[in-house]
Amino acid sequence: EDERAFLGGVYYEAYKKMGAHPMVMNGVAGTHFAVWAPNAVRVSVVGEFNNWDGRALPMHKMPMSGLFELFIPGVKAGDAYRYEIKAKGDVLLQKADPYGNRTQPAPLWNSVVADVSDFTWNDSGWMAERKKYDDRRQPVSIYETSLGQWKSGKELVAFAKEKGYTHVELHPVMEFLEDGSDGYPTSAYFAVSTRYGTPAEFAALVDELHQVGIGVILDWSPAQFPRYAGGLEKFDGTPLYEVKDPEMAVHPMWGTMLYNYDSPMVMDFLISNACFWLEVFHVD
């Protein structure tokens, strides 16, 4: 059923299946990995836990969807990893996890296993009211900022509350490679940038803002992605996430790659990413 939804472009909770998820399976603690690479000959999970050896932990392919998955006992939150993808022609690629919830600090890009559910929320009142909120009939005052401009989240909360803002709009908090880009373009869509702390620390900021009656809006960049060795470009050796026509795939001004919106699986990736921030981190 998950495979059919994924192939149909309606798997809006793909983030619950894809990526790296610490769990206990049959009484054994470890991490479950899942990645989409339909044209790959082989996909392996590599990390310090197997000396970065792609021969050690090959993943199992689901033929209908091109998803690869594997449960690895003993792998835990904090362990760095990436995918070694053997493409056609015996080309070996090293790729970050598109659905990864944490990365090493830029300019490094290896993914890091993280448990983003490990946070206790205290904003139930806000979340209940959010379902009834109609911004077309309510006064709105939005403060736009970047987390990098603040020494601490508490200072931002205090400032926004004092000035009477109803919402805070944050420049992208997702991971990005270039320090001068202010978050554009995004390199890891499901990961809070290490520049801004841990997933739990970002969740705490959203929680505190909600508790004082302030909503959280995120800038989101689903139009383009950066070109780097571990990125989405030719992820399995073929144009998987980007526009298939090479003459149309690169943004003429910025040199970034443009998403292929005709692909249901790319739409899964982008829409589930929006749902991820709304559901997991309670953004508004």
Give names to the regions the model predicted.
Residues 1-32, 60-144, 149-152:
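The feature marks proteins involved in alpha-glucan
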Residues 36-43, 52, 75:
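Short proline/glycine-enriched turn/loop motifs at strand-loop junctions of beta-rich domains
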Residues 43-45, 81:
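Short beta-strand elements bearing conserved aromatic residues within extracellular beta-rich modules
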Residues 104, 124-142, 146-283:
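Substrate-binding/active-site clefts of carbohydrate-active enzymes
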